[in-house]
C-alpha cells in the first residue's frame, strides 16, 4: 500500500511550483508509485475529490466538524482553532501548526520507543468512506471519531492535506487537464486516447487504473455504462451567428428551452435521472421516471434533454420553477401536481449496448426518433425537440422568433456532422439568444449589508474560472438586483461557506455558488486578479444547476472584452 506521506509530499512540492509542465510531472511520478488497486482513490484525491463526481456520494464534512475533530485530537479549544483559521486563512495550514505544536509538547521518554504505523492512502479513504455513510442519530460522532483518528495518526504535514481533502479543496491547482496529461506521461499512452477514455467513463480514476494495467488496449476497452453519467456536451454564444451558419453551409436548428438539463439512463424498467451537475435527482422527479418508462422504447439507453416547468396549457414557466422540482426532497408527489414538467429530448448517446457519441448528429437523431415514442396528446409532457436542417438565414431568424414567442430562450444552432463531445464547449453547438450580456460567475467573497439589511449578506465578490490553473479570478462585486427573499436565501447558503477572516469588511467564501450576472461592459482593471472588472453588474439569478468549474472562464472574459473593442 502507498503511504499518505508520499501523497502529502507530492502536494507540498506542487504548491511550490508555478509551471504546469512541472506539476504534471510530479503528478505522473505519484501515479507511477501508487499500486493499481489504490490508483482510482489517489487520482481523485490529487484532484481534490474523495469520490468521483458522478457517484453522488457526499462526504458531508464542514468546517465545524473539522474544528471539533482537531480540538479532540490536539486538546486546543475550538475558539482558539477558529481564531487561528482567521489568522492563517486556511484550515490546512491551521492543522499543520496545531499538530506541530502538539508534537513539540508531547516528546516523552516512551515516545522514542513508540513506532506508529504509517497512514496509507487506502486508510484515509476508508475513514472518509465511513464518515460519508454515517447517518441519523450519532452520525456526527462517527464522523468526528474517524477524523480524530486520522489527525492523531498523521504527521503535521499529512494533517494539512487531510483537512483540505475533508473539504475537497487541496488548493494545489491540479485539475482534469493536468491529470489527463499525467496519466499519459506516467503510463506512456497517447493523451488523446486518455481524453476519449475519460469522455466515455467520466472517471479519471478508472482511466488511470486501466492505463497502468493494460496500456492502450485496456483504455480502448473502456466504454459508457448505464448509471455512470457522462458529462454533457455544452454550447457557446457566437459573436456572429450568421457568419458561423454561412461557414457550416447547413445547420440543425432546434429551440433552446429555458429549463434544466437532464441526462436520462434507462435499463429495462429502471430509470435514473441526473442533473447538469451529474447529481442523481431521480427521487425528486417521479413523474419524469414514469414518462421515460412509458415513452422510451429501448431496453437500455442514455438520452440528453431539457426539463421545462409548464402551466396547465403547456406554456413554459420561469426557470426557477423547475429548480424547485429538482431540489425537492419532501412532498414530491404534491409538488409534481403543482409544477408539471415537459421533458424535451434532443440527443442520445447510448442505445441497447451501443455507444453513439462518435456518430454524426444526424445519425444520433435517427436513433433518438426511433427510440422515443410520443403523440400529439402527449406533447404537454414529452417531445423530441423539433429539428430543421437549413442554411437559410431568414428561416433561422423565423424559427428563432417562434421560439421566443413560445416562451423559450432562443435557438440552438448545431453542426449536423458533429459528434457528441462530453464536457466540451465549442463551435459545433452554438446558441442564439436575445442580446443581453450575462456571465455565470462564482461567489468568492462577501460582506454584510447596512441598515435594515445589516443581518443579511448584501454584496458579493464574483469570479471567473481559469481552467489552466483551476483558480477563480475576481472580476467585480455585485449587490443590486436582489430581492429580500433572494438575499435571505444567499445568506443562508453562504453562512456555511465562510472561511478565513475579514479583510476590509470582506470575508472569503468557498467557491461553490454560481450566479448569473448581467453587466454593461467589461473594463481593464488592476483592482482584481483577473485584470478585468464588470461595469454596472446586476444579479439575475442563482445557477443551482451549474458547478463552479462550469462558470465562465477567464478566456471568455477576454473574448467579450475584445468583441467590445471591435464594436467601438
UniProtKB/Swiss-Prot annotation:
Keyword Metal-binding annotated: yes
Under InterPro entries, the record lists: ATP-dep_DNA_ligase (IPR050191), DNA_ligae_ATP-dep_bac/arc (IPR022865), DNA_ligase_ATP-dep (IPR000977), DNA_ligase_ATP-dep_C (IPR012309), DNA_ligase_ATP-dep_cent (IPR012310), DNA_ligase_ATP-dep_CS (IPR016059), DNA_ligase_ATP-dep_N (IPR012308), DNA_ligase_N_sf (IPR036599)
Cofactor list: Mg(2+)
**Can the keyword Cell cycle be found in this entry's annotation?**
yes
Q: What is its EC number?
A: 6.5.1.1
Q: Which intervals of the chain form a coiled coil? A: none
Which Gene Ontology BP terms does the record give?
A: cell division; DNA biosynthetic process; DNA recombination; DNA repair; lagging strand elongation
SUPFAM superfamilies on file: ATP-dependent DNA ligase DNA-binding domain, DNA ligase/mRNA capping enzyme, catalytic domain, Nucleic acid-binding proteins
Active site feature: 256
Cited PROSITE patterns: DNA_LIGASE_A1 (PS00697), DNA_LIGASE_A3 (PS50160)
UniProt xrefs under Pfam families: DNA_ligase_A_C (PF04679), DNA_ligase_A_M (PF01068), DNA_ligase_A_N (PF04675)
Which EC class heads this enzyme's classification? ligase
Keyword annotations for this protein, in alphabetical order, are: ATP-binding, Cell cycle, Cell division, DNA damage, DNA recombination, DNA repair, DNA replication, Ligase, Magnesium, Metal-binding, Nucleotide-binding
Annotated residues that bind ATP are located at 254, 261, 276, 306, 346, 425, 431
The chemistry this enzyme catalyses reads: ATP + (deoxyribonucleotide)n-3'-hydroxyl + 5'-phospho-(deoxyribonucleotide)m = (deoxyribonucleotide)n+m + AMP + diphosphate
List the GO molecular function terms: ATP binding; DNA binding; DNA ligase (ATP) activity; metal ion binding
The family line of this record is: Belongs to the ATP-dependent DNA ligase family.
PANTHER family annotated for this entry?
A: DNA LIGASE, DNA LIGASE 1/3 FAMILY MEMBER
Function, in words: DNA ligase that seals nicks in double-stranded DNA during DNA replication, DNA recombination and DNA repair.
Could you tell me what this protein is called? DNA ligase 2
**Which organism is the protein's source?**
Methanosarcina mazei (strain ATCC BAA-159 / DSM 3647 / Goe1 / Go1 / JCM 11833 / OCM 88) (Methanosarcina frisia)
Classification lineage: Archaea, Methanobacteriati, Methanobacteriota, Stenosarchaea group, Methanomicrobia
Amino acid at each position: 500500500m502507498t503511504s499518505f506521506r508520499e501523497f502529502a509530499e507530492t502536494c507540498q512540492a506542487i504548491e511550490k511550483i508555478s509551471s504546469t509542465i512541472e506539476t504534471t510531472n510530479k503528478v505522473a511520478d505519484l501515479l507511477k508509485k501508487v499500486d493499481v488497486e489504490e490508483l482510482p482513490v489517489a487520482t481523485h484525491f490529487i484532484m481534490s475529490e474523495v469520490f468521483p463526481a458522478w457517484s453522488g456520494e457526499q462526504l458531508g464534512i464542514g468546517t465545524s466538524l473539522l474544528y471539533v475533530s482537531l480540538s479532540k485530537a490536539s486538546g486546543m479549544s475550538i475558539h482558539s482553532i477558529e481564531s487561528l483559521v482567521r489568522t492563517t486563512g486556511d484550515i490546512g495550514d491551521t492543522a499543520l501548526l496545531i499538530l506541530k505544536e502538539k508534537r513539540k509538547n508531547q516528546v516523552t521518554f516512551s515516545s522514542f520507543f513508540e513506532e506508529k504505523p504509517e497512514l496509507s492512502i487506502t486508510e484515509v479513504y476508508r475513514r472518509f468512506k465511513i464518515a460519508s455513510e454515517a447517518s441519523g442519530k450519532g452520525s456526527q460522532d462517527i464522523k468526528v471519531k474517524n477524523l480524530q483518528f486520522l489527525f492523531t495518526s498523521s504527521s503535521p504535514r499529512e494533517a494539512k492535506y487531510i483537512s483540505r481533502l475533508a473539504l475537497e479543496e487541496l488548493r494545489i491547482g491540479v485539475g482534469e487537464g493536468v491529470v489527463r496529461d499525467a496519466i499519459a506521461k506516467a503510463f506512456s499512452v497517447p493523451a488523446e486516447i486518455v481524453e476519449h477514455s475519460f469522455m466515455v467513463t467520466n472517471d479519471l480514476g478508472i482511466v488511470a487504473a486501466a492505463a497502468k494495467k493494460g496500456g492502450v488496449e485496456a483504455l480502448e476497452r473502456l466504454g459508457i455504462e448505464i448509471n455512470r453519467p457522462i458529462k454533457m456536451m455544452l454550447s457557446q454564444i457566437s459573436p456572429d451567428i450568421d457568419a458561423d451558419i454561412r461557414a457550416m453551409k447547413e445547420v440543425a436548428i432546434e429551440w433552446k428551452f429555458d429549463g434544466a438539463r437532464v441526462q436520462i439512463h434507462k435499463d429495462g424498467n429502471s430509470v435514473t435521472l441526473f442533473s447538469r451537475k451529474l447529481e442523481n435527482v431521480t427521487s425528486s422527479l417521479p413523474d419524469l421516471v414514469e414518462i421515460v418508462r412509458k415513452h422510451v422504447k429501448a431496453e437500455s439507453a442514455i438520452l440528453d434533454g431539457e426539463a421545462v416547468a409548464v402551466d396547465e396549457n403547456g406554456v413554459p414557466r420561469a426557470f426557477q420553477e423547475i429548480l424547485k422540482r429538482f431540489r425537492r426532497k419532501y412532498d414530491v408527489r404534491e409538488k409534481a401536481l403543482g409544477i408539471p414538467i415537459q421533458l424535451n429530448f434532443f440527443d442520445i448517446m447510448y442505445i441497447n449496448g451501443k455507444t453513439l457519441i462518435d456518430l454524426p448528429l444526424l445519425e444520433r437523431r435517427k436513433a433518438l426518433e426511433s427510440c422515443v415514442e410520443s403523440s400529439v396528446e402527449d406533447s404537454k409532457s414529452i417531445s423530441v425537440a423539433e429539428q430543421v436542417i437549413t442554411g437559410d438565414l431568414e428561416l433561422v431568424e423565423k424559427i428563432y422568433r417562434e421560439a421566443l414567442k413560445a416562451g423559450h430562450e432562443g435557438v440552438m444552432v448545431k453542426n449536423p456532422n458533429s459528434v457528441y463531445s462530453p464536457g466540451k464547449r465549442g463551435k459545433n453547438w452554438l446558441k442564439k439568444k436575445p442580446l443581453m450580456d450575462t456571465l455565470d460567475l462564482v461567489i468568492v467573497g462577501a460582506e454584510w449589508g447596512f441598515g435594515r439589511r445589516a443581518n443579511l449578506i448584501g454584496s458579493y465578490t464574483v469570479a471567473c474560472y481559469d481552467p489552466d490553473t483551476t483558480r477563480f479570478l475576481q472580476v467585480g462585486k455585485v449587490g443590486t438586483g436582489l430581492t429580500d427573499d433572494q438575499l435571505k436565501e444567499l445568506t443562508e447558503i453562504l453562512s456555511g461557506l465562510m472561511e478565513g477572516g475579514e479583510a476590509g469588511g470582506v470575508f472569503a467564501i468557498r467557491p461553490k455558488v454560481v450566479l448569473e450576472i448581467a453587466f454593461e461592459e467589461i473594463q481593464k482593471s488592476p483592482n482584481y486578479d483577473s485584470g478585468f472588472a464588470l461595469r454596472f453588474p446586476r444579479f439575475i439569478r442563482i445557477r443551482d444547476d451549474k458547478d463552479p468549474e462550469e462558470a465562465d472562464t477567464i478566456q471568455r472574459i477576454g473574448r467579450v472584452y475584445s468583441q467590445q473593442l471591435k464594436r467601438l
